[in-house]
Every structure is written in C-alpha cells, then in structure tokens.
Amino acid sequence: MKIGVLALQGAFREHINMLRTLGAEAVEVRKAEELAELSGLIIPGGESTTITKLLYTFGLAKPVKDLARNGMPVWGTCAGMICLAKELSGDISGVKTLELMDITVRRNAFGRQVDSFEAMLKVKALEGGDFPAVFIRAPLVEKTGQWVEVLAKLPDGTMVAVRENNLLATSFHPELSADNRFHRYFVQMAKDYKP
C-alpha cells in the first residue's frame, strides 16, 4: 500500500515523515504518472493559491479528481482543505479548487500568521482523548452538504474537521503534532480502499 503526498509546495515532508513512522510507504507526488498505484493522497497545507494553480499547471487536477470520484481516499490539510472544497467564501481571487467535497470553506478565517494557535479537539473518529491541533492561517468550514460528517469542532462550534465518504479535510495541521492518530486514521482509509 502506497500513500502519496502532493509535493508541489507546502508542508509535504512532515506528512511523509509521519506516514513513514506508521510503516506506510509514502511517496512525493509532482507528476500525474506518480499517482499510479496509490491507495491514498494527501494534499498538504501551504499557500492555497499556489497549490491550486500548480495542480492545474502540472496536469494533476483531472487525474486527482478522477481518482477521488472513483473512491481513492484524499485528505486535505489546511490549504488542502481549500483545494477539496466545492465552494469558497470571502476573498477567493486566484483559487480554482478541485470541487470534490460538498463544503463551503473560508480561507484565512482565523487571521494572519501571528494569529496562529493550538487547540485540543474532541474528534469523533479518534480514540485516546483530545487531539492537539495546530492552526496556522487556517480555513474553516462554513457549510456542509447532506452527506458530510463533521468530525471536530472548536468550542464555539466552528467546524474544523470533516469527512465525506473517501474525502477527509482538516483546517489544522496534524503533521505538525507529535500525535499520529489522524495519520493512522487516514492510513486505515487507504487500507480499506479497493480500486
């Protein structure tokens, strides 16, 4: 089983390292042919305008969409969540998403870099207590479609982790925590995938 991490820009190395600590074969993905034989794909945090532009420039958008629509697990963290969203609100200039997940997302919802924070989250899908979530210029989910499951909210009710079938999205950066439970959860999604 091989899990790819989109390596065009952003925090891809941290995801690779976390996956490898779990014994998963993790590979960097920069070209469409590198999507072959994957059991899952992570779209990391970074700069959403840059990542979405490069997805289309390098011819990755269509094959990623096709694989996701055929059931391959795809997880977007922070900017990756923005990439997966069907709709964006607020300043969306320069961002063309993959329009895969039935969510409306607001970019940079918590402010600038200096407004970054950590929070302990109760996550439905994870056992073992609260999860330490790192938010850096994070988006938030404003609205979900009928089939989207909300996995975690901040104490004020803000949705920050969601799943729709084979699609997973988090506003925060699990790869920047020492806690590997979210990655373990995604590895299990990848193991369950039957192409």
UniProtKB/Swiss-Prot annotation:
Q: Tell me if Hydrolase is a UniProt keyword of this record.
A: yes
The active site consists of: C78 (nucleophile), H173 (charge relay system), E175 (charge relay system)
**GO terms for MF:** glutaminase activity; pyridoxal 5'-phosphate synthase (glutamine hydrolysing) activity
Q: Indicate whether Hydrolase appears among the record's keywords.
A: yes
Gene Ontology CC terms = cytosol; glutaminase complex
**InterPro entries, per the entry:** Class_I_gatase-like (IPR029062), PdxT/SNO (IPR002161), PdxT/SNO_CS (IPR021196)
Catalysed reactions listed for this entry: aldehydo-D-ribose 5-phosphate + D-glyceraldehyde 3-phosphate + L-glutamine = pyridoxal 5'-phosphate + L-glutamate + phosphate + 3 H2O + H(+); L-glutamine + H2O = L-glutamate + NH4(+)
For the ligand (L-glutamine), the binding residues are G46, E47, S48, R107, I136, R137
Q: What is its EC number?
A: 4.3.3.6, 3.5.1.2
The record's function comment reads: Catalyzes the hydrolysis of glutamine to glutamate and ammonia as part of the biosynthesis of pyridoxal 5'-phosphate. The resulting ammonia molecule is channeled to the active site of PdxS.
What's the family?
Belongs to the glutaminase PdxT/SNO family.
What is the protein's name according to its record? Pyridoxal 5'-phosphate synthase subunit PdxT
Which gene name belongs to this protein? pdxT
